[in-house]
UniProtKB/Swiss-Prot annotation:
CDD domains, alphabetized: cinA
HAMAP family per record: CinA_B
SUPFAM superfamilies according to UniProt: CinA-like, Molybdenum cofactor biosynthesis proteins
Listed name of the protein: Putative competence-damage inducible protein
Length: 414
């Protein structure tokens, strides 16, 4: 199904307010497996509104219109849609009663303008507005569905939340988001090209995020369990191709999964940070309850701190500089000893913009110390700026941990 979102309001065209409704609606429709092909903004002008809705009828089956349902003379959405459909407006009694009760609490009586908010299009499904006065509505014709929503964001969102289950028909729509790291969007698309191209129901949609990729799977069925089974089957196909990069679902973050995995395995964690300056620890400690797993991080930015706090040999720093594999190993092992943890991560590298070590900017060493020894990951981010190098280093460290921890992991325990 192709959809068009029409936002009504001269204040949007003038830039007085941002069109946040369009973003929210696009995300909502995407989770329902509906492709939004067009966003249109139109002012409070009857002639132009007729033109815009007529064009939307030509290129979309679902037309979602926000704004223009209020009590003023320039709130014209209902009138325009009714006119185009050859229908009339009538008073919805429940909406009228809500408005009247609201006015009574303020010692006011109903005016003609306020009564206007209770008008709905004939044969429309009325969508009660628990966050405001003007109801929304859904109008079905043989060729189109029109969803009319208030322009006030909190009212629009409340109507969608309250009426989601039947707003887009009788089918159950279920979606699931899979999160991936260590693979770019183009590489993931290449690996899943056939699946993305051919899957319709359930469907697959990739989205790039900062150093990550998420896949949204969406299934529609008359029965909820059937839709969930469809998602399970599609997820298995996806993970068969790119499962080594998968780390979680929904809005779960890498540090959340690190903490959960360590907690399940009964492992404790510490860190030693040079170029990241505490960012690795910050990502973990942003999460409540991190102290059950994470013991601390030594931010050893200067070489003297590496020597004094972690016991990194000065001769090693003199011979190899701080940006080296062996120094990363010494930092990780020093942190593991200092904090008495099962695991310790160390990060050292050149974040730029110029190099102090002779190594190329974007060179990073990430070491993981555990009971079986210490592993080192050499990373290069040649085209990144300082902030992105630090961010990617932290995320790569989290992912390195995940690749080396499994639930009930005994081998890494002290």
């Amino acid at each position: 199904m192709k959809a068009e979102i029409v936002a009504v309001g001269s204040e949007l065209l003038l830039g007085e307010i941002a069109n946040t409704n369009a973003q929210y609606l696009s995300e909502w429709l995407a989770t329902c497996g509906i492709d939004v092909h067009y966003h249109t903004v139109v002012g409070d002008n009857r002639e132009r509104m007729v033109e815009v809705v007529t064009r939307a009828q030509e290129r979309a089956e679902l037309i979602v219109i926000t704004g223009g349902l209020g009590p003023t003379e320039d709130d014209l959405t209902k009138e325009v849609v009714a006119e185009l459909l050859g229908r009339t407006l009538h008073v919805d009694q429940p909406a009228y009663d809500r408005i009247e009760a609201f006015l009574k609490t303020r010692g006011r009586t109903m005016t003609e303008n306020e009564r206007k908010q209770a008008l709905v299009i004939d044969q429309a499904d009325v969508l009660t507005n628990q966050a405001g006065l003007a109801p929304g509505m859904s109008v079905q014709t043989p060729d189109h569905q029109y969803i009319l929503l208030p322009g006030v964001p909190r009212e629009m969102k409340r109507i969608i939340a309250d009426h989601f289950d039947h707003l887009l028909g009788k089918e159950t729509i279920k979606s699931r988001t899979l999160r991936f790291f260590g693979i770019g969007e183009s590489a993931l698309n290449d690996r899943l090209a056939d699946l993305i191209r051919t899957a319709r129901n359930p469907s697959v949609a990739p989205y790039a995020e900062l150093a990550e990729v998420r896949l949204r799977l969406t299934a529609k069925a008359l029965d909820e369990q059937v839709a969930l089974d469809m998602l399970d089957a599609l997820e298995q196909q996806v993970l068969a191709e790119v499962g080594s990069h998968f780390y979680g679902y929904g809005e779960t973050s890498l540090p959340e999964v690190v903490l959960d995995r360590c907690r399940e395995a009964g492992l404790t964690l510490s860190a030693a940070e040079s170029l990241t300056g505490g960012a690795f620890a910050s990502g973990l400690t942003d999460i409540q309850g991190a102290s059950a797993v994470f013991r601390g991080s030594a931010v050893v930015y200067a070489d003297a701190a590496k020597v004094n706090v972690l016991g990194v040999p000065q001769t090693l720093l003199d011979e190899q500089t701080a940006v080296s594999r062996d120094v990363a190993v010494a930092m990780a092992e020093g942190a593991r000893k200092l904090y008495q943890t099962d695991l310790a991560i160390a990060l050292t590298g050149e974040a730029g913009p110029t190099s102090n070590s002779g190594q190329a900017v974007g060179t990073v060493y990430c070491a993981l110390a555990h009971s079986g020894g210490t592993e080192v990951l050499e990373l290069t981010y040649p085209a990144f700026d300082r902030g992105m190098i630090r961010l990617r280093s932290v995320k790569d460290a989290y992912f390195m941990l995940l690749q080396n921890i499994s639930p009930a992991d005994e081998m890494n325990k002290k």
